[in-house]
């Protein structure tokens, strides 16, 4: 399992509007966080999903009920360097700043390792 295929970074557009339809106003931002974690878990196949603090700021920027309709996310599957880690890989989700998230497709991002 330890190869280049296990570490990858992709950019996704997630439609939060359809995932939060019918959710009570006071539960929209917390549910958005849960939905993003669920999305990352599904697409990256990792149990351990970690969110960047900037992503949390983007979700909560307009308050608990003003969650953006769509968000552009960069999800990285990384190796877990901790000793006695339960999972060998984890996903790290961070926001990507774009003018409009409409019409964008999933892109594999080539990362420069320094």
UniProtKB/Swiss-Prot annotation:
<keyword id="KW-0689">Ribosomal protein</keyword>
<dbReference type="InterPro" id="IPR023621">
    <property type="entry name" value="Ribosomal_eL31_dom_sf"/>
</dbReference>
<dbReference type="GO" id="GO:0002181">
    <property type="term" value="P:cytoplasmic translation"/>
</dbReference>
<comment type="similarity">
    <text>Belongs to the eukaryotic ribosomal protein eL31 family.</text>
</comment>
<dbReference type="Pfam" id="PF01198">
    <property type="entry name" value="Ribosomal_L31e"/>
</dbReference>
<dbReference type="GO" id="GO:0003735">
    <property type="term" value="F:structural constituent of ribosome"/>
</dbReference>
<dbReference type="GO" id="GO:0030684">
    <property type="term" value="C:preribosome"/>
</dbReference>
<protein>
    <recommendedName>
        <fullName>Large ribosomal subunit protein eL31</fullName>
    </recommendedName>
</protein>
<dbReference type="GO" id="GO:0022625">
    <property type="term" value="C:cytosolic large ribosomal subunit"/>
</dbReference>
<dbReference type="InterPro" id="IPR020052">
    <property type="entry name" value="Ribosomal_eL31_CS"/>
</dbReference>
<dbReference type="InterPro" id="IPR000054">
    <property type="entry name" value="Ribosomal_eL31"/>
</dbReference>
<keyword id="KW-0687">Ribonucleoprotein</keyword>
């Amino acid at each position: 399992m330890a190869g280049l295929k296990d570490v990858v970074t992709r950019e996704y557009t997630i439609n939060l509007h359809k995932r939060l339809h019918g959710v009570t106003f006071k539960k929209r931002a917390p549910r958005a966080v849960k939905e993003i974690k669920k999305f990352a878990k599904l697409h990256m196949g990792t149990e351990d999903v970690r969110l960047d603090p900037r992503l949390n700021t983007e979700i909560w920027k307009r308050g608990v009920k003003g969650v953006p309709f769509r968000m552009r996310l960069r999800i990285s599957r990384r190796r877990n360097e901790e000793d006695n880690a339960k999972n060998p890989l984890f996903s790290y989700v961070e926001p990507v700043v774009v003018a409009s998230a409409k019409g964008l497709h999933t892109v594999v991002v080539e990362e420069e390792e320094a």
